[in-house]
């Protein structure tokens, strides 16, 4: 019967350095781009998505207001409009992804 024992590593582990694997060189990825810069860049690349998001939020807010006022017909209309706005936003995201995938790399 084999006994279990501790395995001693060849070199001591240092938490400040990444492990070294054969054929893999670790790189540190640093992105100086902040949230604002990334948001503006993504908005310039695909401006339809933020428009769809704002339309969805506006319709949702108006629907909640109609619901709070007790206007069920307006509230129901806003629910249907919200679904259409969400579909528009999803379609814009998918078309943006397709356009990015088809764009040739520089």
Swiss-Prot record:
Residue intervals annotated with topology Cytoplasmic: 1-46, 103-106
Compartments reported by the entry: Membrane
Keywords: Membrane, Transmembrane, Transmembrane helix
Superkingdom in the source lineage: Eukaryota
Domain HIG1: 20-106
Membrane topology: Multi-pass membrane protein
Membrane-side (Extracellular) residue stretches: 68-81
Any one of the GO BP annotations: mitochondrial respirasome assembly
Range of residues in the leader sequence: none
Annotated Gene Ontology cellular component terms: membrane; mitochondrion
Ranges that cross the membrane: 47-67, 82-102
Name listed for the protein in its UniProt record: HIG1 domain family member 2B
Gene source species: Homo sapiens
GN (gene name): HIGD2B
